[in-house]
UniProtKB/Swiss-Prot annotation:
This is Uncharacterized lipoprotein YsaB. The keyword GTP-binding does not apply. It is a lipid-anchor. A lipid is attached at C18 (S-diacylglycerol cysteine). A lipid is attached at C18 (N-palmitoyl cysteine).
Length: 99
């Protein structure tokens, strides 16, 4: 007799638990600091200028992307050689990738 009441009660608990909607998650968006992004751009241009043996004035940074724990800046030289500068979450330079 007890087993007959156990299964419907468990089914009811499972169905009630599944019927509640999950909480709405909102992405965390950090507002970028303009001074930090300008410093990162200058550092990226400096590193790319050294790597490609050209001056900073011949380097163009075209894109700035923010990820969960890092930043990326894309750009190209006057010879149309593409590169990506990577930075950590604090804005410290990590590496320069040639594309």
């Amino acid at each position: 007799m007890m087993m007959n009441a156990f299964f419907p009660a468990m089914a009811l608990i499972v169905l009630v638990g599944c019927s509640t909607p999950p909480p709405v998650q909102k992405a965390q968006r950090v507002k970028g600091d303009p001074l930090r992004s300008l410093n990162m751009e200058a550092l990226c241009k400096d590193q790319a200028g050294k790597r490609y043996n050209t001056g900073e004035q011949k380097i163009d940074v075209t894109a700035f992307e923010q990820f969960q724990g890092s930043y990326e800046m894309r750009g190209y030289t006057f010879r149309k050689e593409q590169f990506v500068c990577s930075f950590d979450a604090d804005g410290h330079f990590l590496h320069l990738s040639m594309r």
